[in-house]
Regions:
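Mature catalytic domains of secreted/periplasmic carbohydrate-active enzymes
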Residues: 1-329
Length: 329
């Protein structure tokens, strides 16, 4: 049986050959690093002083060397997470590395290292911000379905993303986390801005913890990718990238949305003292399942409070690479 699509190439913004090129990357490093690393929790209050962020031996180049040695082809950096603290000196706030205990522009160092080692750079940006509230209601105060952002916050986010996408050169992926509170029009405006500033980049609106079997239109549309967070693709027959999207009763079209699994190498997104690494067997299973079911794997590898990836993590990645060479393809 032949499956047909309307139009045959799909209604998505990017052509199929561009999306297939992204799929061919296969394996990337998610880098969760920032204020949360120093607070010891993923979701800080946003009231922490900027000076608390103070890596003592920051080595961004080491992160990308480790990724390259592990066989990864791209990397995505958390430029701003829930804390609201920015890894670049933003003109739109004073809550950033320029006022912190280590003034290195981490975003600049990241794209420089990616260029040096031949990895595709990507930027993560979180729409939930506990520091820059501007009247928004966050997940800290209400169930996720009742959160919202104000127009002032959305303007702030777009101004910051414009900085990121015009200051540091080309990026291959823009990863917007917790996009639901932006609202449908807010997401459409954000998507359009990113597509205008970086037309070659794939745009991820994170769906949250799902297995990729269905599109959460009301939370994460529009998007170029399907997020599969802390899950593996549901079907052992493989991830199904074609999704039928009904934007209105009369606007029903097929979109090709490649899948990206994201999960940490341990059990926490950020470095937390005492967090344990997954076993070699589990990590190999994650790699093989993602590959066999037709999705990319964005494996989170968090640097510690020094600003380096710990040696135990480096060795785990090397063993995984060797195991993939033996058992994978």
């Amino acid at each position: 049986m032949t499956t047909t699509h309307n139009p045959p190439e799909g209604a998505q913004r990017l052509p199929l050959d561009k999306l297939h090129a992204w799929e061919a990357l296969g394996y990337g490093m998610f880098i969760h690093f920032g204020m949360s690393t120093f607070v010891g929790q993923e979701l800080p209050s946003g009231s922490e002083p900027s000076s608390l962020y103070a890596p003592t031996a920051l080595d961004v180049d080491q992160w990308i060397r480790v990724a390259c040695d592990a066989g990864m082809k791209y990397a995505v950096l958390t430029t701003k997470h829930v804390s609201g603290h920015c890894l670049w000196p933003s003109d739109h706030t004073d809550y950033h590395v320029g006022t912190s205990g280590n003034q290195t522009d981490v975003v600049e160092a990241f794209v420089t290292a990616c260029a040096k080692h031949g990895l595709m750079p990507g930027f993560y940006y979180c729409s939930w911000d506990n520091h820059h509230r501007f009247g928004s209601v966050t997940w800290s105060e209400a169930p996720l379905e009742r959160t919202f952002t104000t127009a002032r916050y959305r303007d702030f986010q777009m101004a910051q993303i414009e900085e990121l996408l015009t200051r540091y050169g080309p990026v291959g992926e823009v990863w917007v986390d917790i996009p639901g509170p932006l609202g449908h029009e807010g997401r459409r405006e954000q998507y359009a801005q990113i597509a205008s500033l970086q037309p070659e980049a794939v745009i991820m609106m994170n769906h949250g913890c799902t297995d990729g079997s269905s599109l959460r239109y009301e939370y994460a549309w529009p998007t170029d990718l399907m997020a599969i967070e802390r899950f593996m693709p549901a079907s052992n027959r493989g991830y199904k990238p074609w999704h039928t999207v009904a934007q209105t009763r009369t606007d029903v079209q097929d979109y090709y949305l490649p899948g990206e699994v994201c999960d940490p190498i341990g059990y926490e997104w950020f470095w937390v003292e005492g967090d344990t690494l997954r076993s070699d067997r589990e990590l190999l299973g994650m790699r093989l399942i993602a590959q066999e079911r037709g999705t990319n794997l964005l494996l989170d590898v968090p640097p510690d409070q020094r600003g380096v990836i710990p040696e135990a993590t480096v060795q785990a990645l090397r063993r995984l690479h060797r195991n993939m060479e033996q058992f994978g393809s």
